[in-house]
Regions:
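A contiguous, surface-oriented mixed alpha/beta subdomain in the mid-to-C-terminal portion of proteins
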Residues: 212-216
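N-terminal-proximal low-complexity accessory segments that begin disordered
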Residues: 1-67
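Structured, mid-chain assembly/scaffold modules that mediate subunit interfaces
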Residues: 45-207
Length: 216
């Protein structure tokens, strides 16, 4: 039986010169995860209003999302009413309104579009689709101007269980109105954990959550 060859290990010798595996010298040996602190709404508002790069980051994807329009289809076939619907929506400048709502969602973590529909009911009552004639106007609200009133769906079998069914909206003049959620198109913000969403009163993430250090 032959002699076992000795294995020469000079890792420690080499590492002493290269720094490999040494935490203080090898950037791949260890790393720290720094958590970002969410910006206050006013900080985001100022950033979006006065920082040109921040505004582009918010608005360009929002504008692109609506630039091609859309069509109504059944399977792969466009339905007969599609062009009529688009014509009606163009009359109320749907693309500008949706781009604005998407921009506020990206910037603030949430927004909503109030659909002004004459169905013979009050704003705080559920929308009656059978009596609804047409969408007369679309009004956009940022997350800052929307608050749940404390009324929630309580039936566990309801797909909307736990969600608010009544919101208070405040316009630019300070006037407020209670609105049933069926009259709103809600944009709930970027994907975050349920725990973080609870911390943010049901709203989601913003584009500034992960890039704020590069802008401030």
């Amino acid at each position: 039986m032959g002699k076992k060859k000795k294995t020469l290990r000079n890792d420690g010798f080499v590492n002493a010169f290269t720094g490999q595996g040494v935490k203080s010298r090898d950037p791949f040996a260890s790393y720290n995860v720094d958590s970002e602190i969410p910006l206050y709404d006013k900080e985001i508002d100022n950033l979006y209003t006065y920082n040109g790069i921040a505004r582009k980051i918010v608005e360009i994807p929002a504008d692109d999302a609506v630039s091609e329009g859309f069509k109504l289809v059944n399977g792969s076939d466009e339905i007969e009413q599609s062009k009529l619907v688009m014509s009606e929506l163009e009359d109320i400048k749907w693309d500008n309104k949706f781009s604005e709502a998407l921009s506020w969602e990206r910037a603030m973590g949430g927004s909503a579009i109030l659909m002004m529909i004459n169905d013979g009911r009050r704003f705080d009552e559920p929308l009656d689709l059978k009596s609804a004639d047409k969408i007369e106007r679309l009004d956009v609200y940022s997350k800052q101007d929307i608050s749940a009133t404390g009324s929630y769906y309580s039936d566990p079998s309801d797909p909307k269980y736990g969600r608010p069914y009544m919101y208070t909206l405040i316009n630019e003049y300070g006037n407020s109105i209670n609105v049933h959620e069926s009259r709103l198109l809600l944009f709930r913000g970027g994907r975050i954990s349920k725990e973080e969403r609870r911390f943010r009163d049901g709203w989601g993430g913003t584009v500034f959550d992960v890039i704020q250090r590069r802008l401030i």
